[in-house]
Amino acid sequence: MLNETPALAPDGQPYRLLTLRNNAGMVVTLMDWGATLLSARIPLSDGSVREALLGCASPECYQDQAAFLGASIGRYANRIANSRYTFDGETVTLSPSQGVNQLHGGPEGFDKRRWQIVNQNDRQVLFALSSDAVSYTHLRAHETELH
């Protein structure tokens, strides 16, 4: 299921939320901004359902948190100290995003961009960043794992 929110993402367009379900009863909610996981509700053997993710109260709150909750991390994961590295003997300088360091792709990381929804149904979604030749799929049918 695909829904738009009245709240607008940093690019001025509504956040697009997707809800996926599988045969095991798992329900996952994602948004196209940052290809972000918002919720993963897992059925337990006693019949109850448990939320498996930490998250924010609303899609727009994800812009103001620094913990990368549910985020798609990239172009790289982790910290680049002092926002620079050496490649083929040349120093490459990056924009800092956490103090003097760059973290998880920096100010223009994958979590801060709108991903294209290439293909989507009730059981899976394929997101892509065509400019970076990056794509990934969430939740396949008959599984209780995210891939």
Where are these regions (language model features)?
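Beta-strand-rich N-terminal accessory domains
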Residues: 3-61, 65-69, 73-77, 81-92, ...
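Short, well-ordered turn and helix-capping elements at secondary-structure junctions
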Residues: 24, 131-133, 143
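Covalent nucleotidyltransferase core used to form phosphodiester bonds in nucleic acids
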Residues: 76, 93-120, 130-136
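A short, structured loop/turn motif at beta-sheet edges
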Residues: 86-90, 117-124
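General alpha-helical segment detector with a strong preference for membrane-spanning helices
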Residues: 93, 146-147
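Conserved small/polar residues in nucleotide/adenosyl-binding loops
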Residues: 137-146
